[in-house]
């Protein structure tokens, strides 16, 4: 429901004057040199975490936007505790390391829509190429189109 994301007293997200609720309507943009990426990943509580994971897979690991969208995800659904939900595609050694650090893991089947779903578009101005990515966790598709010559060029 609208305005349903406030929490009761005692919570960091409790309703109060001059406050705004934690909310996850967050389209995002990345830019470096001649490359622009616009993306969004829906998924409620998981949305900001999925955004950060998507960006990390591009920036830190050099993945293309489709690979970054498909990479196994994890989420922390609460402010407290050590519970972490993971897609079962997360490598076994990573799961073992998390458990050794005291995390309580809940496994979800691969490409679970519990971890949101998103789309991304990328424009490489230097190459004159557009790219698209669609998350297999939801219904959607990245459909290729001809690049239209930019105005004035």
Task: Explain the meaning of each model-derived region.
Residues 1-112:
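Proteins synthesized as precursors that undergo proteolytic processing into mature forms
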Residues 63, 83, 88, 92-153:
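Terminal-appendage/accessory-domain detector
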